[in-house]
Design a protein with these regions (language model features):
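Phosphate/pyrophosphate-binding loops at sites that engage ATP/ADP/AMP, CoA/4′-phosphopantetheine
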Residues: 56-69, 219, 239-246
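A contiguous, well-structured pocket-lining segment that forms one wall/lid of small-molecule binding clefts
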Residues: 184-248, 254-272, 292-295
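Short, well-ordered amphipathic alpha-helical segments that serve as non-catalytic structural scaffolds
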Residues: 27-29, 48-63, 235-239
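Short beta-strand-loop/turn "lid" adjacent to the catalytic site in phosphate-handling enzymes
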Residues: 58-95, 99
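Glycine-rich beta-strand-to-loop/alpha-helix junction loops that act as flexible
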Residues: 72-75, 136-138, 249-258
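A short helix-loop
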Residues: 7-8, 15, 24-26, 126-128, ...
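Short glycine-rich, Thr/Ser-proximal phosphate-binding strand/loop in the N-terminal lobe
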Residues: 8-47, 151-152
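Conserved phosphate-binding catalytic cores of ATP/NTP-utilizing and phosphoryl-transfer enzymes
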Residues: 103-131, 289-293
């Protein structure tokens, strides 16, 4: 069996896959954000991860004697200068567990974990380059992925899609993180937000300003939510089409949004490969699969 550990900005995750690739365990705990706040300080995230990890490991303790290798997300993406303190919680814990179990430790990154989780659970086994759309609270990137590398070919030049969603949600009185509740409450609307795409790069700050204006003018929040999701989906459609003709794998929590899924499915048909929303949000399943493949 192979153990994956991931400590992202808002979720503590551990997962185990078997020798044959079956998901044996998938445990997660969301970090707590105070009411009215739009996020956590990294130091607070580290503190909460260090409290959560022993609890999650306790839940999978019966499998620990069978673990052959451990893998952990050591940084946000596979770049030399990629760094966030929250991942130190996972790496520190993984080092200790590796030593105590006397098994090898593999270091990977959060982004590749997302891609692997989505690809495996969607049964997407590409034979050539494809585009992964990474949509989360801290990231909006288009990645050209092959068997060796994931190259950023487009991104937001200001705020990520998830941050746009959470800012608008908190403005409208929702608890952070807001994406799931906004998805559930989104109502039909005639309101539109500006779409700003140059090549495969996107700007969302103009959409945020217009959403604030709509809210102050009395447009119902539920309609603004739909306008936000439409803006994100339309921006992604344009950015991907500008990148070329590829199969597409959406990953990250924002990708699970209903409006975005429907829009991209209509735009790209069989070329877009959505997995179950459970494997789009932050998890350690992909890290466990990476562990299995690299062992």
């Amino acid at each position: 069996m192979f153990l994956g550990i991931d400590t992202s900005c808002y979720t503590t995750s551990v997962a185990i896959v078997s020798d044959c690739g079956e998901i044996v365990a998938d445990k997660r705990r969301l970090l707590t954000v105070a009411e009215g706040k739009r996020g956590l300080r990294q130091s607070e995230g580290v503190f909460q991860h260090m409290k959560n990890l022993p609890v999650l490991i306790e839940e999978i303790k019966d499998f620990l004697p069978k673990i052959k290798t451990i893998a952990v997300s050591a940084k946000p993406r596979n770049k030399e200068d990629s760094y966030m303190p929250v991942f130190l919680a996972g790496t520190s814990f993984a080092r200790t567990l590796s030593a105590s179990l006397d098994v090898p430790l593999i270091f990977t990154d959060h982004q590749n974990g997302h891609i692997m989780a989505a690809a495996k659970s969607a049964a997407f086994m590409p034979e050539k380059e494809f585009i992964a759309i990474h949509l989360s609270g801290g990231t909006t990137e288009l990645l050209k992925v092959d068997s060796e590398n994931a190259e950023i070919i487009g991104k937001t030049l200001d705020i990520p899609a998830g941050q746009l969603i959470d800012r608008i949600g908190v403005m409208c009185g929702l608890m952070f993180p807001c994406g799931k509740e906004m998805d559930e409450k989104a109502a039909p609307t005639q309101s539109k937000l500006p779409v700003s795409v140059k090549g495969s790069n996107i700007n969302f700050s103009g959409a945020e300003i217009q959403a604030e204006r709509l809210f102050k003018s009395g447009v119902p929040a539920d309609e603004i939510f739909t306008a936000v999701f439409w803006c994100i989906a339309t921006s992604l459609e344009k950015a991907v089409k500008n990148a070329g003709d590829y199969h597409i794998l959406p990953v990250g929590g924002v990708s699970s949004n209903t409006v975005i899924r429907q829009h991209l499915t209509k735009a790209f048909g069989e070329k877009v490969h959505f997995t179950h929303p459970k494997y789009m949000t932050d998890n350690a399943v992909g890290v466990a699969y990476i562990c299995r493949e690299r062992s």
